[in-house]
Amino acid sequence: MEQVVIVDAIRTPMGRSKGGAFRNVRAEDLSAHLMRSLLARNPALEAAALDDIYWGCVQQTLEQGFNIARNAALLAEVPHSVPAVTVNRLCGSSMQALHDAARMIMTGDAQACLVGGVEHMGHVPMSHGVDFHPGLSRNVAKAAGMMGLTAEMLARMHGISREMQDAFAARSHARAWAATQSGAFKNEIIPTGGHDADGVLKQFNYDEVIRPETTVEALATLRPAFDPVSGTVTAGTSSALSDGAAAMLVMSESRARDLGLKPRACVRSMAVVGCDPSIMGYGPVPASKLALKKAGLSASDIGVFEMNEAFAAQILPCIKDLGLMEQIDEKINLNGGAIALGHPLGCSGARISTTLLNLMERKDVQFGLATMCIGLGQGIATVFERV
């Protein structure tokens, strides 16, 4: 079986969805920009030698519809002979895109793929066109379709207080801002064209979603966003709304070596699981455990974790049940997470994996794990190993 390696990984800055940097930039353009950038950064690989493009996107309508993967590839002037497919596993879409490409390479059906994802939540809102079948309520609580209420449920089940949530959210912003100031994101962010507040076209090379002024005291003043009577989850402890894309160059180890491209890491194992939709945010726990089992590892073997921060009330129970509460500041989301950077749905799996690879190199650790919860009750995880 072929060894699957990550040769390169990049992302756009994360733009605010409401009047942000990418308010006049389409999702296809964000995607095409990264496709072109990956190929330009790795000239030893001819674009025509790509076997496929796997691109995650959740709201596949309007500008994100009609196979955005192919549309973006055409905009990027990837040769017409290279196919492309859009992948949808809701929040896990671009990580699923990685898994799909990895399996193609493992079986010998592909040697080189572009992988990534995008979501422009300013242009195509998360709830646009949603129409759940009324019969679902016979088997699943109606609130399972309301992500904020699933986070409230997890908080109550696991004893996650409002104070714990506020502290974690403040940490996310502080860590993300520190990473920005120190240049920790420089190796992953590709400057991307957008418009500033005055409408002037400029290149953005930083995440505009981060709020460095965030404090626990300020967060404590916010009202519950989803359960106004007894809730603890606020807008400040939820992932921000943002627009962005992320991309990876994934190859067989043999092809990378033949081309003189240095692999950054290999895919050690992959897992996806289902869980109760009413606590959809718990999915990373069984997914991570299964991925670790497949890799022959334990949580203690992992040097760095990237766990998508859908809500502070969601990620804290996952950290707790993976036995990592005492290691948060040493291993978990060291550059902040989606509470500060936002969670562009189809982008996030590739985004957290990209950040993870850079952290693994900076911290000089052998193993890293990226995982995320998925709406309606799923979890997805990937174990990476440096090579």
Swiss-Prot record:
Active site: 91, 343, 373
Keywords: Acyltransferase, Cytoplasm, Fatty acid metabolism, Lipid degradation, Lipid metabolism, Transferase
Catalysis performed (reactions): an acyl-CoA + acetyl-CoA = a 3-oxoacyl-CoA + CoA
Enzyme Commission number: 2.3.1.16
Pfam families (UniProt xref): Thiolase_C (PF02803), Thiolase_N (PF00108)
CC annotations in GO: cytoplasm
Pathway: Lipid metabolism; fatty acid beta-oxidation
Protein's cellular compartments: Cytoplasm
InterPro entries registered for this protein in UniProt: FadA, Thiolase, Thiolase-like, Thiolase-like_sf_Thiolase, Thiolase_acyl_enz_int_AS, Thiolase_AS, Thiolase_C, Thiolase_CS
Any GO MF annotation of the entry: acetyl-CoA C-acyltransferase activity
Biological processes per GO annotation: fatty acid beta-oxidation; phenylacetate catabolic process
Gene3D superfamilies listed in its UniProt record: 3.40.47.10
Broad enzyme group: transferase
SUPFAM superfamilies: Thiolase-like (SSF53901)
Main localisation: cytoplasm
CDD domains recorded: thiolase
NCBIfam families named among the record's database cross-references: AcCoA-C-Actrans, fadA, PRK08947.1
Record note on quaternary structure: Heterotetramer of two alpha chains (FadB) and two beta chains (FadA).
Function: Catalyzes the final step of fatty acid oxidation in which acetyl-CoA is released and the CoA ester of a fatty acid two carbons shorter is formed. Involved in the aerobic and anaerobic degradation of long-chain fatty acids.
Protein family (similarity comment): Belongs to the thiolase-like superfamily. Thiolase family.
Protein name: 3-ketoacyl-CoA thiolase
Gene: fadA
